[in-house]
């Protein structure tokens, strides 16, 4: 018996043949790294204490070069000047709700996935509140602004300028001895690609690339350049029509000790209860949903506030620059 020249059963002839396989694991969401919150010095607001915290410091005393007169007390001495600022907490709330059909029939754990996306939204909200404050203060204080000229880019020299500008007004570095810097990826490229004398490449050309962090690791820590420890984040503001109509300005920030003061209610760390995403499952009907069609929800509800340091001397610098690749 001769064999057939073609198969009698092929996929197109089967009505129940699966045309598509649905992967049950979502690809990783393209989220920005968020590094502004760690730049803040945290103050704890106790529960049942209102939503406003007054912080203060003292103005530094000046030298007294007048020699004392023998036997004559020096008048009334000196007075102390306190500088105060009010940190007000705001309430941030959001949620995602899920139908019973989604919970019962979806091929992946949509509730857990939604909670993860909502957690990022909450964290991004905090970083955005911080960058909005930084820009608002910098727009009103020329000493905070370092603007790179059209046709020039982020460099090690600008990192040193930001550090020394802060040191010149007696702003101290963070506890690790470095100022804290956050910049977007396109500015980070220009920084680590700076081949000028004294630039990033020149500084580290005789250093092992891993030890010098020339190869940016998954932690998105660029390294310490000019006394600033730089981290990479793309959740930072931009400006269109920068100096010329075809260019975009990117914002980077360098922050010193007490440059930003932040607070929340009760707990102050992102991993603690104040910033937790709550997942609720509704197993019984309620008045507004008598048919129990909403089966689950993910939500956050937290308080957060941030202010610049007290007094007229700000403890941060903003660098605005276009990028050679952006």
Question: What name fits each language-model region?
Answer:
Residues 1-88, 313:
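N-terminal "assembly arms/tails" that initiate or stabilize quaternary assembly
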Residues 2-39, 151-161, 193-326:
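Sequence/fold signature of self-assembling virion shell proteins
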Residues 7-14, 100-107, 111:
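Disorder-to-helix initiation segments
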Residues 62-66, 190-191, 240:
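Short, solvent-exposed loop/turn elements at domain surfaces
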Residues 79-106, 271, 278:
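Short acidic, glycine/tyrosine-flanked loop/strand segments centered on an H-E-D-like triad
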Residues 105-174, 185-192, 324-326:
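Alpha-helical scaffold segments that mediate packing/assembly in large oligomeric complexes
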Residues 172-178, 223-228:
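Short gly/pro-enriched beta-turn/loop segments at secondary-structure junctions
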Residues 181:
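Polar-ligand-bearing catalytic/cofactor-coordination segments
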């Amino acid at each position: 018996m001769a064999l057939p020249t073609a198969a009698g059963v092929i996929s197109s002839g089967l009505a129940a043949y699966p045309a598509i396989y649905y992967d049950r694991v979502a690809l990783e969401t393209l989220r920005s790294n968020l590094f502004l919150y760690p730049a803040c010095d945290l103050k704890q607001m106790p529960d049942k204490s209102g939503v406003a915290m007054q912080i203060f410091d003292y103005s530094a005393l000046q030298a007294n070069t007048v020699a004392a007169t023998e036997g004559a007390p020096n008048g009334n001495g000196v007075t102390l000047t306190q500088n105060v600022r009010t940190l007000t907490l705001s309430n941030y709330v959001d949620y995602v709700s899920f139908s019973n059909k989604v919970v019962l029939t979806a091929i992946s754990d949509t509730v857990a996935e939604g909670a993860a996306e909502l957690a990022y939204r909450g964290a991004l909200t905090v970083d955005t509140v911080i960058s909005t404050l930084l820009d608002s203060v910098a727009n009103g204080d020329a000493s905070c602004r370092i603007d790179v000229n059209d046709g020039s880019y982020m460099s090690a020299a600008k990192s040193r300028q930001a550090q020394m500008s802060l040191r010149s007004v007696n702003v101290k570095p963070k506890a690790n001895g470095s100022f804290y810097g956050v910049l977007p990826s396109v500015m980070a490229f220009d920084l680590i690609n700076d081949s000028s004398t004294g630039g990033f490449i020149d500084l580290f050309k005789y250093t092992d690339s891993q030890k010098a962090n020339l190869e940016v690791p998954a932690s998105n820590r660029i390294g310490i350049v000019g006394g600033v420890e730089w981290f990479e984040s793309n959740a930072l503001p931009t400006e269109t029509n920068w100096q010329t109509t075809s260019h975009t300005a990117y914002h980077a920030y360098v922050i010193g000790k007490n440059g930003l003061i932040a607070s929340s209610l009760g707990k102050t760390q992102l991993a603690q209860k104040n910033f937790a995403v709550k997942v609720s499952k509704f197993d019984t009907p309620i008045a507004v949903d008598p048919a129990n069609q909403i089966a689950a929800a993910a939500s956050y509800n937290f308080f957060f506030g941030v202010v610049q340091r007290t007094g007229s001397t700000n403890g941060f610098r903003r660098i605005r620059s276009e990028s050679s690749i952006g």
